[in-house]
Amino acid sequence: MNEAEKITAEMFLPEMVQRYPATRAVLDLYGLHGCGGPQGPREQLGWFARLHDVPIEKLLRELNESASQAPSDVPEFAPSIGDTIYRPFFLAGIATVLTLGCMWGAINLLTIGLKQSFTAVNYSWVLAHAHAMVFGFVGFFIMGFAYQAFPRFKHTSLWRPKLAFTALPLMIAGILLQTVAHLLSPSSLQLEIAAATIQTISVIIFASTIVMTARQAKKPEVYDRFVYAALGWFLLAAVGNPVVFKLFELAGSREQLLFNLATFNIPYRDVQLLGIAVVMILGVSLRLLPHAYGLREPSRAWQGFLFWGVNGSILAGVVLFIAGMSSGNHWLLIVQWLTTFVLLAVAIGTPRQYRLFGPVPENERDRGLKFIRAAYVWFIIATAMLVFTPIYNFAIYMPITGSHVPFSHAFFGAYRHALTVGFIMMMIVGVSSKVVPTLSGVDVRRANSLWPTFLLLNLGNLTRVSSQIATDFFPSAYSVMGFSGFIEVVGLTLWGYELFANMRAGKKLERETSVHEQNGNGRFRITPQTKVADVLTHYPQLLQVFLRHGFGPVANPVLRKTMARVVTIEQACRREGVDLTELLAELQNVEISDQPANSEPVVPITRIATIQ
Ligand code: HEM
């Protein structure tokens, strides 16, 4: 047995890659591809095997074989656009939360609270907030996560990463334009159509990238159909978006607006929240929870019920509700109500299937788990509220308040935020808090625990849901509700900052590696993006080459320590009008002696004098 065969399931990825650089190629084959930086995330091999669905014995055998490879055979670490594609999407999601999304929602809520009326806030503002949350916050996180994780889970690479990326600027532009269209309504239909078209193109790009990635992978898995269904709901929501804008923003009269809202608001939001977000979350849970936390895999029968039950109830619910409301046939609405029981059954049964609240081994636990557990508790609360809605309306709301309309806006809004903030947002916060440090090469178990975010988000949402229902009976509850949004925003700001810091750490790691790009011999590689100072630190003798090409400032030790640290070879060439290819060739071809890395380059005194 040689030394290489000491690679075991307990070994941490970075330690292994550091000792046996050739093993990274094997991890790449199973979907590592730049995740966690050049040496992979700080996780054990057993965890990697489970997450990437590779039999551990096979993985260990291949790793041990590759470990004995000659250092010169080791491929260079060259991260590509697809390797960190989640980053700009997640950043856009965080930015949305802190501006048009939750921040705007909190301002709306404060206005409602202070004026003690749900109609006190401009409805266009509510619509703009809701749209930014669904297409922006939920959309960006779903896109970023899917682009990053889907190809890796399937041991392939992302189909056309540059095209995939364009979904981001398109979606940002579409959402911003749509926000303006809401603010300018009713004179903004054309702007809305333009905004909706751009967003639809973005969704089509996203959906086709995922479908084509799956096709090239040829590795069908149980959760795939959830992803496809969520993509289908996303497309439907994108196509329906301008229609809904017209119905809600451009209704001819108040009666028409009330009819449109009563008939189409619930179905449209169901397509968005249940169709896009909940279906995708259920699919991601299926892939992530058993593989990342070692939880039990739901039975085949439950997986089937989960898929057909949820998608069936959304579809039937949407059709029956629209038909019932527009025809006045109450039987259709009763059947629609029955579909909500399926959602409640899913919410109760799914965490049981995973044994989500059972013991999880110490080494599998991390900061994301508490959010994921809380999310499933909120899912049960939200679906129980949904089932209870007609009972509340007829048996509690109407008799106590004397209302003639069997619909409490307060109760339904409370249900909606139990689902959106409690389940959808909590889940996104939990999963992102787990994957971002992992992908950035930060040890998730040593990272910030995010307890303040967890407590504030739950406290804020609990206050919001309970006080919003209480506004039906006690006007004083409005003021409590009014401030609850800011509790959530503070929690989310802490979370956003933490993720941002994790991503920055990952970026730094990559920069360092791209600067210290090494091949199997541990040798430094010079590329157009390499900083001038790094070249000189590694190969002080190359100073002469720079000077020959007219880079005067590098002769000055102070400028070498300052300016040269931030200027890349490419930038320096542009600045000095030097041919990049020629310089690179010369730098790379110079016979490099093994000079100590830290030695100061020696500049002839006369040369310094002439340059300065
Ligand atoms: C800090 C978090 C949030 C705050 C303070 C907030 C605030 C509000 C307010 C004040 C309303 C209007 C009142 C009402 O109808 O009940 C509203 C509506 C809405 N919000 Fe939020 N929200 C938050 C998070 C979210 C999230 C995470 C989502 C989606 C994932 C979301 C989606 C919606 C939707 C769909 C509506 C209904 C719009 C309609 O009437 O059609 N919100 N939100």
Which functions belong to the PLM regions below?
Residues 510-521, 596-612:
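A short, highly charged, low-complexity intrinsically disordered segment
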Residues 49-50, 64, 68, 143, ...:
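Generic short alpha-helical segment signal, independent of protein family or function
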